[in-house]
């Protein structure tokens, strides 16, 4: 650095010079403006390095991507060393506040600064402390302004789009040239975005008079007296402010379609949203700034951190925002962008950036342009308001053509030299921009330059008027006149814009920029804005409406007929009247803006006395702090009629209160001054209406707005409350979360939230700042906090596990609310008092308040929090036991879910449109019940582990969707939910306390049934400390009385209310429902129907285990049938035998049959029936008998006879029963035999035989057959007896026997077949018998059997399955519905056969899945090969997202549960084999090929079974390819070959590591780890890309979990996935490698550590600290994914090739290598040495050469 430059540095007092030059960045920030003014600068490009994050200068060798991302800076270059340069760039200091910045009470300064710079884009403006407090109000109330802007813009767009053919719309929204409409079709999200962009400007519009930056604003013309702006503010403050509420009214009118200004207002809002959308760097579509680099530039330059100036975009980029500017507009913008450098409010370096203060001052500027008493409305000028603005010289004036609405230039200068005056009309686009410049930009430019601007001197071409002596006119006066008279000015030079500059823009800028807003649109938009902002009386006041049209420079009739804006009755207004009315309108407009000075409002006399006194007091001492004095509006009177009107709005004209208590309490809440009220009313009483009606009454008050809050304990109740309270549109209801995040929106009447919201710090801060927000933001004190309502407040005391979450409620300012209301149905005095004290209140008053004692409080000055809460106990007052309208039954059952399923089935059979709630004790039980019952009902389930949004969605679905039948959940579903169709509540909880019982029963509003089911021989678990004890055995009513403190009525009438069988207090509908349920229960008992709901181990089952298991008696049997039902059929008899049984008995009989059989009877029967007996039976049955038997028993019976015969008998029988025999058998039952049989059996008898299982016959038969007789018959039936009976049985005897064997006899016989019986039957049927049986069961027989077996019969067969077959089955497979549709059975059974066939094929293809099979076995590898190729560490996370990871399906095969192909006893699932097969494919492919492979198998991403079939087709090819590609790997890992570095020619030539001894390699390895340990470097990141980032937690951790958390916190895994091939696996794959996947390798590594330690001690070397296992694994993983290192290692070490799986890499790294001195070192040490060698400055070039050599060597080899 030169000596002169160094002195300048010292003069600039750049104290941080030395430290800044030592910075690693090439770009150094410098805050000294003097330095940059005195030392020459240059423009250089810089970019941010992705690896290091440093800012570096663009050099010759910089890559193309870095050049593309570069940015330019004006810098000073400094040499800080040999060939080392640093570059200084100017960055100004933070604004300096007087006395230092004071943090806001509710926002930290950092948030304020971020909000100001981000939202308002005012980097160059300086604010004081008061300004920050004002601007912070927008942050606190952003939601209000966002919603307001969005609603207005949405409505405007709706109107404009809906009226395309309207005359006013056509004129307003149609292009003058093309005639095409310009109203774009915008999506709602786009409109919302535009509306949100407009919100900051609307806020500044309302608070512009409160910002200090406008203190420099002076609004006087030259020669007039200057006005004191402080006095102006004091004059404005006492006046009645125009409230923000007016804007809300605009929104409401638009929503109700009362407005007629929507189309006009749309234009101006669209102009704000589209034309002022230019944002800071990084916005959508930003391009590089284009500026003219002159000595004094017209367009000031702005760095990349500021806003872009004068965006010049190409019209050929459709993705850019529509902001293309043509030459004229660019000229207008640039001409007013230059401002003087001496203004305090702007930046000293760059002047002011145009787009910064356009956003701030768009709505705020109002200028006084003529005489003192004549006012001009800025932004709403009349057409002749611009007629005096000169274009270039005094003879070039600007006019507006009233017909075409185009700008006209009047001039007497022509290029031909003539002085003939001409009027030149501009085109529409140019007219738009000129008008925009005159009415908007020039006004803001004047405001920004201020009264001290004096750059212009007096020239002859200037007309100086209004001064007695022109020679005494100062430069300041001249400059003022020029600004108001001429268009194209260069304010920096103090002259007009040169013609060369104008031509330059014409050459550079596009000439075909698309038209945005034409003149008519802009003009009418400005007029519409003026109408809305001046006052609401424009809509109703006749004269002022007419004045608005005069201000637009057309008649009233024109405004009505052409524009369709207002409705008038006058056709004209005289000029004098129009002038007066315009003055009044202008005064209101200017007063509202608060920017003009020295005027006296003509209606100031209308102010009240309070305002005048306040104004005088403020003006007497203008140096004191100005406080806004607002007129305090009295609270509107309340009456009892308000509540009645509210009830009629909500419930209709027939509204009446439930009783007198409800009426009086509702009046107490609405009208009394009691600050805090607690109410205990029974569930279902209507507690919600106690505050709902007062809220509606408050919302109807027009003068005062009340904002109330309701809090409920659970998210489930939140959804229900919002639905109930928002009905009929009486209240605007919103979630509290909206208020916490965005503030009050000005519309909502009631916010609803949960207890967690009430306890949050953000909510507490919002309430604490309420008064300040309302006064400053809404400029009124008439928006008040209404009621704070807490429902079910007893939870504050009873919810022990949540009490720590309620601590934040004590910080809430309860005194800010008008009234606090606490409601509960289960809060006696003791519970209520403790709950209130827990949240910081005083508690209950000593004496609970009676409902009739409506006394006012004597002294409420202490506030709500210090005043005791008055308790209204409606339960004690009525002296009635609650919930008497509900029938409550308590049962002890064997299985709670089984009993609950029976009750629900019975309920929906009798009441199909009803709903039910089931309360479970655990979340696991909830999920199990939902999964099990989904086939019977439409189920919704909820528990606490679900997210808040999901809870709300599911609750809303159950409440609103009539098809949903059952809601299953934990106790959170029992509080506060109101469902009219609810008729049953079932509680499956052994720890139920009295509050939970009352809340659950209370859901039954209009009566119903409540069942409390508990298991037999169970005991209630111990309750936690502080919790209520579980309910006791005995009468429920008595326990409820005791809880509420009511008088006991033991021994009196009314002791049992809805319990213990009492039905006295129940409604008629409830009694009828009970009777129907009882009849269904009796019918089920008579039929002895058993419904198996869940296995006995249901309570202990784990809900997370969703695998489907399939069972059969013999795994190797080819007849393995899906499900326990078919399996049990195979266990006892073949399918055909079961079919014959089903033919003779109906569904009900079979069901009871299977339930009542005992084992010993069947066992003795089977034992006494030997082969000889059966043979005798078959031989002694003559043809006639056989025929008669065939008549009554189908061919199925014959099949059953074959089953019972021994092996020899069966073979002979089967051999003689061929196709011909079957035909002869059928023929022996000829017509004669049939007829004789029929003749012996009368019509009535036949009917009884055919319908032997009908109700009447069965009952009479049952009564005549006793159990004792049946038992004695079974006892006396020996082998001999059976033989004689069979031989003497003729046709007639058979008939009588059949007629005497009633349903009960069949049941007793069948009922004795249990598991033992089935086993004995199977034992007597040997292999030969089974084969012959199978051979005799033809396809035709099976079909006929299927047709004869109804759906119910099959289900009854399923129910009789032996217990052994069920023990491994899934509970869902054993469920059945007793009324299943018969027509669906054929489809189900066909589906079962298809699934059975598929399962058989898969089991045959993968026979070893019952063992620890892997895919390598399937491919045919030997065990020793599998040992080294084994895929440990490969799990489901190896698969990419979406591959074999579908949820809600079977985890074993990824199919629907009904189509699951898994089988019982399967240890290795098909999905596991599929992801192992995917890993095998990865073994054979590099990254690019594997990525393509994943795309090719996309059809199989959700079907692992299908993928296995696809994989199996090429198994031989895959096996050969693995053998070929991994032969070297197997040779090395099996120690058959040894790697020697001396055998690698390329390694010896290209790396010094290959010439090192083993000891040198080890020393280098330990040195690397020592350096890493000292610097606490992140291991995985270092070995991945040599990045030395610190991670102290990784080195201090002692377990894998902490290391993984540290790496995850640092984003290592995320970077690994984004930068390497790890992205081809699941997101958790690499992270899970640190778990127990590699425990075998870990043990080997730990053994090797001991060996290394012994070696070092033996060599006399100080033992080095070797890395622990986690760091070692991180190293290997980092090296595996380091592509550059892998390529070099594979190039240098010729004995190895590529491996693509991490497990193989880990095994390979542990093999031993012979170093140059023939000593053995692990390969991973050699790897680290090579990695270290690569870590040098010339790595990129070296890598490139290595790859070239590698490729060339391969070519030579080939």
From Swiss-Prot:
Biased composition regions of type Low complexity, renumbered to the chain: 1142-1360
- Record-annotated Helicase C-terminal domain positions: 900-1051
Q: Which residues form a coiled coil?
A: none
The induction text for this entry reads: Induced in absence of telomerase TLC1.
Q: Could you say which enzyme class this protein belongs to?
A: isomerase
Name the SUPFAM superfamilies on file: P-loop containing nucleoside triphosphate hydrolases (SSF52540)
Q: Which InterPro entries match?
A: DEAD/DEAH_box_helicase_dom, Helicase_ATP-bd, Helicase_C-like, P-loop_NTPase, Sir1_ORC-binding, Y'_ATP-dependent_helicase
Region Disordered, annotated ranges: 1142-1384
A single Gene Ontology CC term: cytoplasm
Reading the lineage from the top rank, the first entry is Eukaryota
Annotated ATP binding lies at 681-688
Compositional bias of kind Basic and acidic residues: 1361-1384
Domain named Helicase ATP-binding: which ranges? 668-845
MF (Gene Ontology): ATP binding; ATP hydrolysis activity; helicase activity; nucleic acid binding
The entry's function note states: Catalyzes DNA unwinding and is involved in telomerase-independent telomere maintenance.
Protein name in the entry: Y' element ATP-dependent helicase YIL177C
Native source organism of the sequence:
Saccharomyces cerevisiae (strain ATCC 204508 / S288c) (Baker's yeast)
